[in-house]
Design a protein with these regions (language model features):
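N-terminal glycine-rich phosphate-binding loop and ensuing alpha1 helix
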Residues: 2-49
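Residues that recognize and position ribonucleotide moieties
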Residues: 14, 95, 102, 173, ...
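Short, high-confidence coil segments that cap the C-terminus of an alpha-helix
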Residues: 42, 90-91, 119-121, 207
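Short phosphate-binding loop-to-helix
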Residues: 46, 52-97, 101-114
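A conserved hydrophobic position in a structured secondary element of the catalytic/binding core
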Residues: 49-50, 104, 175, 223
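Conserved core of the sugar-phosphate nucleotidyltransferase
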Residues: 106-191
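Conserved alpha/beta core of the MobA/IspD/sugar-nucleotide pyrophosphorylase nucleotidyltransferase superfamily
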Residues: 166-239
Length: 239
């Protein structure tokens, strides 16, 4: 299954300024994400950013990067613009790897592409098991699987559906390019706004989302200084 990877990266972060350029044991955060993505079977890997500083950094480390608009309503809008800039064909599959996941498992990227192909799906994503502290944490998005990898619903509240069946959603997606362009043309839905979850826009418009369990060992999104310190510890352990 042929696919491409796009990694959104923004400098603006209220909790961790200049996040993509933070050093993690000798490599920047964005460099570590790119390195992992390149270990997948992706046809190409690009960083999509609104920052000339990140563009310059990517040039220094030999990474393909494109400059997008500063203001987008969602990350999916930025992804859609990126596909237009890169002139990707409408039937191509794009895996959206978050720019703050330095230990993303390349197998997860490949497996998402396989899932999208096997289900003929326009939108696919990943999940893993919840740990105790995450059950009540509204910053941790939950999902429920209905059958045959189909997502029943997403919520920040584990009691939204059966709590024992809730899984931790990992914000890594696969989309077909033509679906991306359709998605950004839809108005924000009520559930999207109420839950602050952009994937609800797809579900509220009747689109099925499929998900598989991650095979990765580490699921760390670097959002705070404490996350950064943990990432440094993991990187040292893996070196």
């Amino acid at each position: 299954m042929s696919f491409r990877v796009i990694i959104p990266a923004r400098l603006g972060s209220s909790r961790l300024p200049n996040k993509p350029l933070k050093d993690i044991d000798g490599k920047t955060l964005i460099q570590r994400v790119v390195d992992q993505a390149k270990k997948s079977n992706a046809k190409s890997v690009h960083v999509a950013t609104d920052s000339n500083q990140i563009i310059d950094h990517c040039a220094q480390i030999g990474v393909n990067a494109i400059l997008t608009k500063v203001h987008h309503h969602t990350g999916t809008d930025r992804l859609s613009e990126s596909c237009e800039i890169l002139k990707f064909k409408s039937d191509e599959l794009i895996i959206n790897v978050q720019g703050d996941e330095p230990f993303i498992d390349p197998k997860d990227i490949d497996n998402l592409a396989v899932l999208a192909d096997s289900r003929a799906a326009n939108m696919v994503t990943l999940y893993t098991d919840l740990i105790k502290d995450e059950v009540v944490d509204r910053n941790v998005v939950k999902l429920w699987i209905k059958c045959q990898d189909k997502v029943e619903d997403f919520s920040r509240n584990a009691t939204h559906l059966e709590p024992s069946m809730a899984k931790k959603h990992l914000g890594i997606y696969g989309y077909k390019v033509d679906f991306l362009h359709t998605f950004v043309e839809w108005k924000q839905s009520k559930n999207e706004i109420d839950r602050d979850l952009e994937q609800m826009r797809a579900m509220d418009n009747g689109e099925d989302i499929f998900a598989i369990k991650s095979s990765g060992q580490y699921h760390l999104g670097v959002d705070t200084e404490s996350d950064l310190q943990r990432a440094i510890e993991i990187a040292k352990k893996l070196s």
